[in-house]
Curated annotation (Swiss-Prot):
The chain crosses the membrane at residues 7-29. Belongs to the ATPase B chain family. NCBIfam families: ATP_synt_b, PRK05759.1-2. It is a single-pass membrane protein. This is ATP synthase subunit b 2. F-type ATPases have 2 components, F(1) - the catalytic core - and F(0) - the membrane proton channel. F(1) has five subunits: alpha(3), beta(3), gamma(1), delta(1), epsilon(1). F(0) has three main subunits: a(1), b(2) and c(10-14). The alpha and beta chains form an alternating ring which encloses part of the gamma chain. F(1) is attached to F(0) by a central stalk formed by the gamma and epsilon chains, while a peripheral stalk is formed by the delta and b chains. F(1)F(0) ATP synthase produces ATP from ADP in the presence of a proton or sodium gradient. F-type ATPases consist of two structural domains, F(1) containing the extramembraneous catalytic core and F(0) containing the membrane proton channel, linked together by a central stalk and a peripheral stalk. During catalysis, ATP synthesis in the catalytic domain of F(1) is coupled via a rotary mechanism of the central stalk subunits to proton translocation. Component of the F(0) channel, it forms part of the peripheral stalk, linking F(1) to F(0). Its main location: membrane. InterPro entries: ATP_synth_B-like_membr_sf, ATP_synth_b/b'su_bac/chlpt, ATP_synth_F0_bsu_bac, ATP_synthase_B_chain. One of its GO terms (cellular component) is plasma membrane. Gene3D superfamilies: 6.10.250.1580. Keywords: ATP synthesis, Cell inner membrane, Cell membrane, CF(0), Hydrogen ion transport, Ion transport, Membrane, Transmembrane, Transmembrane helix, Transport. It holds the Pfam family ATP-synt_B.
Length: 156
């Protein structure tokens, strides 16, 4: 047995095996590895993209929530302003009604005073007539005349 020939045969067999593997086995293995690597890279990219999308969605959600809170606060503020305005309008209406009622009552009081004055004038004229009749009917005495006038003044 010749060691050199065996070694040469094994080397040739190995070279054929390597050539066969490089020609037929290696390309599908490399293609599978590249495909797997591409899938992994695509998966990582999709995960990164999803992470960015999630962050964007969270930012948008927080912004929408902030805007909603601001809108709610604005609506509440407007409602409070409107309520205060309505209260002020009601107060003004009550004050105006009070003034109107007070003026009406004052006018009625003035009318009552005028009626009372007219009634008193009528009574004074009646009393003056009665006093004049008593003065003219009685003697023209200075003392009696002053007593009648004092009595009339007391009656008024």
């Amino acid at each position: 047995m010749n060691l050199n020939l065996t070694l040469l045969g094994q080397a040739i067999s190995f070279a054929i095996f390597v050539w066969f593997c490089m020609k037929y086995v290696w390309p599908p293995v490399i293609a599978a590895l590249e495909e797997r690597s591409k899938k992994i890279a695509d998966g990582l990219e999709a995960a990164n993209r999803a992470s960015r999308d999630l962050e964007l969605a969270q930012e948008q959600a927080s912004q929408i929530l902030r805007e909603s809170k601001e809108n709610a606060a604005e609506i509440i503020e407007q409602a409070n302003k409107r309520a205060n305005q309505m209260v002020d309008e009601a107060k003004e209406q009550v004050i105006a009604d009070g003034k109107r009622l007070r003026e009406a009552a004052q006018a009625e009081i003035e009318q009552d005073v005028m009626r009372a004055k007219e009634a008193l004038r009528a009574q004074v004229s009646v009393l003056a007539f009665a006093g004049a009749e008593k003065i003219l009917g009685a003697t023209i005495d200075e003392k009696a005349h002053s007593e009648i006038v004092e009595q009339l003044a007391k009656e008024l």
